Regions:
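ASCE P-loop NTPase helicase motor core
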Residues: 2-175
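Structural motif
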Residues: 86-90, 216, 261
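Conserved helicase motor core of P-loop NTPases
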Residues: 119-259
Length: 261
């Protein structure tokens, strides 16, 4: 299901049901951030799929483990499977085919595997479109959540995400105060307003620190590409300081205190 359709609520309901049945449950997601969100939303420990499968980067262990990409192996595999009655994977759209294969190898027959995700969200960085292909195959029981519930429906971000999926024009009435369009035609004005938003307006009205704010751009090069914007953001948010270490790499300066992704 898409944003605001109740995926997290459904996961919580399933956890409650299986706990009532006395089942052992494992929760996992493809990234650390997604696993952290899953833990916060459910109150149960979730971990990355790599951690669940006990990934190892030690070359000395490779002869004992299933190899999956770049010499890493997994301690959990067909010979040493996961012991659980139910495994719930969130953000399944980000799982690539190699990781999914490793997960399937480590699951015992009879284990319930529940995959949750939004096929229109972030795809996997690695090969394959596992969630989309599984859905298109119709080989497994599948439930699609379509209704946007009241709280999520009050967010213009959620509403516009669904409008875009339906091929409709986005709405800019901004009732929820979380979706803004500022039209600017001058590059220098864009720079100025970007810094104002990050240093003053968003911290004042939303309570976000500059470190909590992420600037996105569809380009790497050019006056509005990430290389130029990063240089400008660094100049204002993390200026040169004799007490901060820095390292130049080509035309880029990496400085202590920079935000790194």
């Amino acid at each position: 299901g898409g944003p605001g359709t109740g995926k997290t609520t459904t996961i919580n309901a399933m956890i409650h049901f299986f706990e009532e049945e006395g089942a052992d449950i494992l929760l996992a997601a493809p990234t650390g951030r997604a696993a952290k969100r899953m833990t916060e939303a459910t109150g149960c420990e979730a971990q990355t799929i790599h951690r669940l499968l006990e990934v190892s980067g030690n070359p000395e262990d490779d002869d004992k483990r299933d190899k999956v990409g770049f010499g890493n192996g997994f301690g959990r595999n067909a010979e040493n499977p996961l012991e659980s009655d139910v495994i719930i994977i969130d953000e399944m759209s980000m799982v690539d085919i190699q990781l999914f294969q490793a997960l399937l190898k480590a699951i015992l027959p009879g284990t319930r595997l529940i995959l949750v995700g939004d096929v229109d969200q972030l795809p996997s960085v690695g090969p394959g479109q596992v969630l989309r292909d599984l859905m298109n195959s119709r080989a497994f029981p599948m439930v699609t959540l379509e209704k946007i519930f009241r709280q999520a429906g009050q967010s213009d971000i959620v509403v516009n995400a669904h409008r875009i999926n339906r091929g409709e024009q986005i709405t800019l009435d901004n009732k929820s105060k979380d979706f803004f369009l500022l039209e600017r035609n001058d590059v220098n004005v864009i720079y100025k307003h970007m810094i104002q938003l990050i240093q003053d307006m968003l911290p004042r009205y939303v309570g976000a620190t500059s470190f909590d704010i992420q600037v996105l751009t569809p380009m790497r090069k050019g006056s509005l590409g990430c290389e130029t914007l990063n240089e400008i953001l660094q100049r204002y948010l993390n200026p040169a300081d004799p007490h901060k270490k820095e390292h130049a790499y080509g035309n880029t300066v990496f400085r202590e205190g920079d935000k790194v992704m």
